[in-house]
């Protein structure tokens, strides 16, 4: 690592043979109902999991540190939506979703005993991420009744997403955006 003047700050390689064995089952269930030919209503709930990755526990920047107690994220996700095709011209998928993470991995600024301020990567807190997504696709070939040997469509995709930490043992995190 070099400073802004090009001087060598640190040239150190640390080897690790750390192993994190895991064994688990993730469960989920989904349902759908089609009250009309052009409309399907669906919902899903499932457990989610994100393991600590190599990039979570390896750093090259001396301004970053890794919390030695970093653990995997666990939680669940829910979604509810409607989708379908209207007159073979317009297809759509509109959904609401929520993801809940226990012990979400992230960075926090920390003051260390030597007075240095560093970004520490570790488990920040419990987080919820929620939003709305939509996709509307217009089949231009069907709309203009053109030969089916060709394909062309126009689509609009939107997402509205918000998130926040619901609980954390770290001061100043609860209620903040993820």
Predicted features by range, described:
Residues 23-25, 64, 76, 118, ...:
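Exposed loop/turn and edge beta-strand positions of beta-sandwich/beta-sheet ligand-binding modules
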Residues 91, 96-100, 118-178:
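Gram-negative outer-membrane beta-barrel transporters
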Residues 1-36:
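Signature of Gram-negative outer-membrane beta-barrel scaffolds
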Residues 32-34, 38-46, 50-52, 56, ...:
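Membrane-embedded beta-barrel scaffold of Gram-negative outer-membrane proteins
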Residues 8-18, 62-68, 77, 117-124, ...:
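Extracellular loop and loop/strand-boundary signature of outer-membrane beta-barrel proteins
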Residues 29, 67, 142-144:
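Generic recognition of flexible, low-complexity loop/linker segments
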Residues 2-10, 54-61, 104-112, 146-148, ...:
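Outer-membrane beta-barrel translocator domains and adjoining extracellular loop/strand segments
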